[in-house]
Regions:
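Short coil/linker segments at helix-helix boundaries
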Residues: 65-102
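Canonical positions in the second alpha-helix
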Residues: 11, 44-45, 105-106, 140
C-alpha cells in the first residue's frame, strides 16, 4: 500500500481536482491505519464535492475510528490521577465530536441511511453530557427507530 500512496500522490500532483484519486488515497491510508492522513484526504474529497454522501460519511467514519483507537489506548492505561484521566477523555471525546458534523451532512444528503443514523445516535449518546448533545441523541434515536421500523 505504501507504493500505492506514491503512485496516487504523483497522479494527484498532475490532477489535483480528481475526487476519485483523493478518495482512493484516503482509503489506502485507512488500510494503513493512518487516520489523520485518511481524514485529510477525505476533507479534500468533500472540498471538491461537498454534496457527495460518501465523502461526508467516510469523514465521520474515520473520525469515529480514530476516536475508537484513542479510546482503546486510554482503556489500556493505568491512571493514578483523575486530572490526567479527564484530560485524556476530553481528547477522545473531542475526536468523536469531530465526526458529528460530517455524519449530519451525510444524513442531510441521504436522510434514510440507517448506518449514518446509527453512528449519529451512538456518538451523541456517548457525548450526551455535552451541551445540546442529548437533544441530538433523542432526535437521531427517534429517526433511527423510525427508519428501522422499531416501535
Amino acid at each position: 500500500p505504501a507504493d500505492l500512496v506514491a503512485l496516487i500522490d504523483a497522479a494527484i500532483e498532475s490532477n489535483p481536482e480528481n475526487v476519485d484519486l483523493w478518495f482512493g488515497r484516503g482509503r489506502i491510508f485507512y488500510a494503513l491505519k493512518d487516520y489523520d492522513q485518511s481524514i485529510e484526504s477525505f476533507k479534500k474529497v468533500v472540498e471538491l464535492k461537498p454534496d457527495l454522501f460518501e465523502g461526508n460519511y467516510y469523514l465521520g467514519v474515520f473520525y469515529t475510528i480514530k476516536g475508537d483507537a484513542l479510546n482503546k489506548e486510554m482503556n489500556e492505561k493505568q491512571y493514578s490521577s483523575q486530572a490526567v484521566y479527564d484530560a485524556d477523555l476530553k481528547v477522545v471525546n473531542d475526536v468523536y465530536k469531530e465526526a458529528v458534523p460530517w455524519f449530519e451532512k451525510a444524513h442531510q444528503i441521504k436522510p434514510d441511511d440507517v448506518d449514518t443514523l446509527e453512528f449519529l445516535k451512538s456518538i451523541c449518546f456517548r457525548l450526551r453530557d455535552e451541551a445540546g448533545i442529548m437533544e441530538k441523541y433523542n432526535t437521531y434515536n427517534a429517526l433511527y427507530k423510525q427508519v428501522k421500523g422499531i416501535e
